[in-house]
């Protein structure tokens, strides 16, 4: 186990930069590291190669440009049982804790707590770009997109990630999607919990240009669209482009909006099966 604290760089990676190599972190701590100007990765930059991150904590790291804790570009690997707390992206491109591009890692049993982006971009915890990452059994609490969208996770048409059995609690966004904002990609969720998330449009989830939405065994409890009387969709806001939305074996309770659509703002045909 190793400790990396209070390091800084003007370009990539306040603490660790790995280029086309293999890197393994086990029981490590990376805190208060900073990438000061362009490029990003407050604590780490992983460019190509292979990585394994297990039982490691990333706390209060900061990047001016993308990926408050880690910028992953073209690297393959996994993160397990690790904590990301209070990491920030402050100026551009998003991803308060992680920005993942051209890479498809697995994220298992990780915790993302109070990470944020104040950039005019997206993803208080994670921004995904050209990836089919899988995120499973992980917890997202109190992550924020302070000026734009996706309090927890953002992805667009270049990505097709998978999500199962995660918890999203008390995440928030100034604009779209307290937990998720999906721009142009399909959205498939299985067994996820959304509790007390809030935004202007879509307290839990918002989509734009998404064709297919599928939620199975999802619980949506107490999410809110609460910015103003023009807010809409306490839980899920579907904007243009949806051709199919299916909700199966799911529970919607206690969601509300200061404006319209307490639970669901539809677009296109919708199908509900065994929901309450």
Please identify what each model-predicted range represents.
Residues 1-8, 22-34, 50-62, 76-88, ...:
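Right-handed parallel beta-helix
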Residues 8-17, 34-47, 62-72, 90-100, ...:
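Extracellular beta-strand/beta-solenoid scaffold signature
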């Amino acid at each position: 186990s190793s400790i990396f604290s209070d390091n800084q760089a003007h370009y990539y990676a306040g603490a660790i930069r790995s280029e086309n190599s293999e890197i393994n972190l086990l029981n490590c701590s990376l805190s208060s590291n900073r990438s000061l100007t362009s490029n990003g990765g407050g604590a780490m930059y992983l460019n190509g190669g292979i990585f394994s991150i297990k039982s490691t904590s990333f706390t209060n790291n900061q990047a001016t440009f993308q990926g408050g804790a880690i910028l992953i570009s073209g690297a393959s690997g996994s993160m397990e049982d690790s904590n990301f707390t209070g990491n920030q992206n402050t100026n551009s491109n998003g991803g308060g804790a992680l920005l993942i591009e051209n890479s498809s890692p697995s994220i298992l049993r990780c915790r993302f707590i109070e990470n944020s982006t104040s950039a005019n971009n997206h993803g208080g915890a994670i921004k995904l770009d050209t990836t089919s990452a899988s995120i499973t059994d992980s917890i997202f609490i109190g992550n924020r997109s302070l000026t734009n969208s996706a309090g927890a996770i953002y992805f667009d048409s270049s990505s097709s990630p998978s999500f199962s059995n995660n918890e999203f609690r008390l995440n928030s966004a100034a604009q779209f999607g307290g937990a998720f904002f999906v721009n142009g990609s399909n959205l498939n969720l299985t067994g996820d919990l959304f509790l007390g998330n809030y935004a202007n449009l879509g307290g839990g989830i918002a989509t734009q240009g998404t064709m297919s939405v599928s939620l199975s065994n999802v619980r949506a409890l107490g999410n809110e669209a609460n910015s103003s009387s023009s807010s809409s969709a306490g839980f899920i806001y579907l904007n243009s482009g949806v051709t199919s939305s299916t909700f199966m074996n799911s529970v919607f309770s206690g969601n509300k909006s200061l404006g319209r659509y307490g639970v669901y703002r539809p677009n296109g045909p919708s199908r509900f099966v065994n929901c309450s």
